[in-house]
Design a protein with these regions (language model features):
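Conserved Walker A/P-loop ATP-binding site and its immediately adjacent core
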Residues: 22-27, 34-59, 78
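Conserved motor-coupling elements within RecA-like helicase/translocase cores
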Residues: 58-94, 105-108
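Hydrophobic residues in beta-strands of the RecA-like P-loop NTPase core, especially within AAA+ ATPase
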Residues: 96, 113-114
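Pre-Walker A adenine-sensing motif
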Residues: 1-9, 31
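Pre-Walker A (Motif I) flank of P-loop NTPase domains
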Residues: 9-16, 24, 39-42, 91-92
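Post-DEXD/H (motif II) to motif III coupling segment of the RecA-like Helicase ATP-binding lobe
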Residues: 25, 110, 117-186, 197, ...
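Loop/turn-to-beta-strand initiation segments
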Residues: 39-42, 66, 89-93, 107-110, ...
Length: 204
């Protein structure tokens, strides 16, 4: 958390590179609570709304009706209702997909872009064509808000930007709560081909 705060104080957005189960969600929640306590609102971007179960449960328990959702599966009526609540500053935390970037936010203080590497932020088959990550950073600049891009496997462009000082790079290399890393085995496929005839399937 200290490194994240240092980067944000320097006026930089943050690339949070954390291995699976490293505690990214825990850090997100801390920054969300801090932002709300400071009287600002939060936009939590996801490539797919189905990825939100863990964080939704915790936020719903604490913020109730101040938590909102926006995605393509909503009806037109539901979308208008969310638009109205955002406009009237009734929603403090909005969890949504890329289309939520066009909502009339009030007093936005933090944008979290989770799974920032995901291609769903820049689909080629869905109109309008735009890169949601780039749009989110522009939105953060417009509102003078902070932005955190999180991923276990950062995109090349975000990693490059971090290494060139445009983003604050924060690496979480250990699993949260001493959760063990998965075991893996390096396989030599040149040797494997010769033995494939002797078994139904080789290790993957």
């Amino acid at each position: 958390m200290t490194e994240i705060n240092e980067g944000l104080r320097e006026g930089k957005n943050v690339l949070l590179h954390g291995v699976t189960s490293s505690g990214k969600t825990h850090l997100y929640l801390e920054k969300i609570e801090e932002t709300i306590a400071n009287g600002k609102n939060v936009l939590f971007l996801l490539p797919e709304i189905a990825l939100t179960k863990q964080i939704i449960q915790r936020l719903e328990k604490k913020y109730g009706k101040q938590l909102g959702f926006y995605h393509q599966k909503l009806t037109d009526f539901e979308k208008v209702e969310v638009w109205r609540k955002v406009k009237n500053n009734e929603i403090k935390i909005l969890i949504g997909t890329r289309s939520s970037l066009f909502l009339p936010f009030q007093n936005l203080g933090l944008i979290i872009i989770d799974e920032e590497h995901d291609a769903a932020y820049k689909p080629r088959e869905v109109k309008p064509f735009f890169n949601a990550k780039d749009a989110a950073l522009v939105l953060a600049y417009f509102y003078q808000a902070k932005a955190i891009l999180g991923s276990a496997t950062p995109s090349v462009e975000s990693y490059y930007a971090a290494k060139n000082g445009k983003l604050k790079y924060v690496f979480l290399g250990e699993r949260f709560g001493e959760v063990a890393l998965p075991k893996y085995e390096i396989i030599n496929f040149k040797i494997g081909r010769a033995s494939c005839r002797e078994r139904v399937s080789s290790p993957v």
